[in-house]
Amino acid sequence: MKLLMLARNPNLYSHRRLVEAAEARGHELDIYDTLKMYMNITSHRPEVRYQGRVLSGYDAIIPRIGASITGYGMAVVRQFEMMGVWALNESVAIGRSRDKLRSLQLLSRAGLGLPVTAFAHDTSMTDDVLDIAGGEPVVIKLLEGTQGVGVVLAETRRSAKSVIEAFRGAKVDILVQEFIKEAGGADIRTIVVGGKVVAAMKRQGAEGDFRSNLHRGGSASKIKLTPEERSTAVRAAKVMGLNVAGVDMLRGNHGPLIMEVNSSPGLEGIEASTGVDVADKIIDFVEKTAVAGKTRTRGTG
């Protein structure tokens, strides 16, 4: 198969591993910078171009779209969909998962476990917003934050109000969530591929940090999921419409609580901690599933 990865940095561990896995299976996997692609939007022969030539003849694309370029990245994926090229994760699904508020609303509608979450624009009702989230301590998150950046634990009502006012003063949108104390600064990252959990790890926050992101100095170890956790991860990926997803959960007193669903999960931490060749499982899924013209959206979403 001839495959194309949409990614800004070909040297990232995850991207190198996907190339290795593809080549080991006899496939060709090119990596081109998403931001350097451009489009010919026409009715009869839509094109994506790169350095003056048309990108054609690909059996499938593997989008690895960074959060900072979501809008343009989705447009490029959508253009390939209009050309009938199969996408590992489709543009509409990527958009759902990147919009934190929308993803929480969709997961909530599906009846999946979530931390109690409040969202408001006006700061005049901050006390009620904090009460909705169960009262202090609360976790305050930037809607656009990634890798633990823009996430604050406010342990008192006064500090919570100060943080909310500061964020709103900067004209950024935030979520206020209940603090899940029983999680103990740890979360679970699962990788779902084609409707199956292929790997799972526990991430423990660094000493004194409630955030468990490995980018923030956390540690990782292999973990055995409960049947409910496994089912929750699979259902979350399905709600988003993602063929490949990183689903982050907390272990609450009443079951798993979804924190985030990621459309471009990193592979380094989870492959190292579990020993699972996640990259190979992703390429195996592409190999078995990619069919030209099979894209569900065809660029309509």
Swiss-Prot record:
The ATP-grasp domain extends over: 104-287
Gene3D superfamilies, alphabetized: 3.40.50.20, ATP-grasp fold, A domain, ATP-grasp fold, B domain
Q: Which GO terms describe its biological process?
A: protein modification process; SOS response; translation
Q: Describe cofactor binding as the record notes it.
A: Binds 2 magnesium or manganese ions per subunit.
Q: Which UniProt keywords apply?
A: ATP-binding, Ligase, Magnesium, Manganese, Metal-binding, Nucleotide-binding, Protein biosynthesis
Any one annotated GO CC term: cytoplasm
Binding of Mn(2+) 2 occurs at E260, N262
**What residues does Mg(2+) 1 bind to?**
D248, E260
Sorted alphabetically, which PROSITE patterns does this protein's record hold? ATP_GRASP
The family database entries (Pfam families) matched by this protein are listed as: RimK (PF08443), Rimk_N (PF18030)
Which residues are recorded as binding Mn(2+) 1? D248, E260
Its name, as the record gives it, is Probable alpha-L-glutamate ligase
Organism from which the protein derives: Maricaulis maris (strain MCS10) (Caulobacter maris)
Gene that encodes the chain: rimK
